[in-house]
Structures are given as C-alpha cells and as structure tokens.
C-alpha cells in the first residue's frame, strides 16, 4: 500500500487487491488503498475469497466499489460465488451474455435488458448453488466470527512459539495472522507434510 502513490499513474483505471493473502495471512490496509485509488479517480475491486470467512469487509464503511468471494471458502458448495457492486457501477456495465430473465423486452430490432443486477445474470441460474450457499451463510450466522478468528490466531501463535524452539525453523507468518506458513532448513516441504500426516497432522505443502 505504501507504494501505491508511486505506482498509480494517469493511465490507472482500476485497483484490484486481495483482502488477505492465503500464503502469509497478510492483509493490506484497505482503507488507505481505497483512499489512494479513489483520489486518483480509480475503481476498486477487492478479492475477499480468503478474507470473507475471517473478517468480512464492511463495503459501505470502506467505500469498496466491487467485492467478490467464492462460496466454498465459506463452507458452501463449489461453483458459486458472490459479487457486490455499487448500484451505479452495475447499471453502467453492459451484459456479457444475453438470454433468460435478463431480458426485459424483445423486438425485431433487438432487445432491452432488465435493470441491475438481473441484466448481468443471463440464462439458468445455479439454483442448487444459491440454496447451498444460503444455508452455509445461515449456519455461519450462528457463530461469532470474531471469536473464532481470535481463537485461530492464538492457536497459530502457540504453534509458532513451539516450532521456533526447533533448529532451522523459519516463519513466514504475517503479523498476528491466523495462518502460519513455515519451513525448516534442510527439510523438503513434501517430506515434512508426508511425515506429519502419519501423526494425524494435516498440512499443505508447496507453492501456491
């Protein structure tokens, strides 16, 4: 975020950034980034796929233009996701596909579309996916996400402190993230994951 004033040029039109890194757990300062971008006349797109389940962004308070996340990251089905967009921006967008309920009126000269968001939803919707994601969101609503995130961070800290006592340990954890990425000098990550799996410890290895 500190580099944005140097990177933004008069040709810059859109700033796309992730809410949270799924490698280090790092989170950019969205408020600062959005302020920089908007002052330059840019539109901001935030990828919330990794962050939505940890700390949902307040799109109105942060003045986010577009915010997207996938359903399976919230314990919902695959093949479904959510795109939030400011109404004036959605209305200004042209449909990328035609057909189905997105059409308002048809004539020999062409067709007119429904208003947003329906004009952007051509064809048969993913009904099963929508129902599944809705059920997942209802289930999540019964839990305190902030409390769960705090608990996850404490577990990550506990693991990091314990592993730091071992020689060759190197942590890539960002700040106080609930995600802990690490390696050990001289030990291949695939070997480490395979060995730990025999003790009932499930980890993910390799580049991502």
Regions picked out by a protein language model, each given a short descriptive name:
Residues 1-208:
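Pyridoxal 5′-phosphate
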């Amino acid at each position: 975020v500190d580099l944005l004033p140097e990177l933004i040029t008069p040709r810059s039109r859109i700033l796309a950034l992730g809410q949270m890194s799924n490698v280090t757990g790092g989170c950019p300062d969205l408020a600062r980034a959005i302020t920089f971008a908007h002052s330059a006349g840019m539109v901001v797109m935030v990828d919330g796929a990794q962050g939505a389940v940890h700390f949902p962004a307040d799109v109105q308070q942060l003045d986010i233009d577009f915010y997207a996340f996938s359903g399976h990251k919230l314990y919902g089905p695959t093949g479904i996701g959510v795109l939030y967009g400011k109404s004036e921006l959605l209305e200004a967008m042209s449909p990328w596909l035609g057909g189905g309920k997105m059409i308002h009126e048809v004539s020999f000269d062409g067709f007119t579309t429904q208003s947003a968001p329906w004009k952007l939803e051509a064809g048969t919707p993913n009904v099963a996916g929508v129902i599944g994601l809705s059920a997942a969101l209802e289930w999540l609503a019964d839990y305190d996400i902030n409390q769960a995130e705090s608990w996850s961070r404490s577990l990550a800290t506990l693991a990091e402190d314990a592993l730091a006592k071992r020689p060759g340990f190197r942590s890539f954890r960002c700040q106080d993230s609930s995600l802990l990425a690490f390696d050990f000098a001289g030990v291949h990550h695939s070997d480490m994951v395979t060995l730990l799996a025999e003790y009932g410890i499930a980890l993910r290895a390799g580049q991502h």
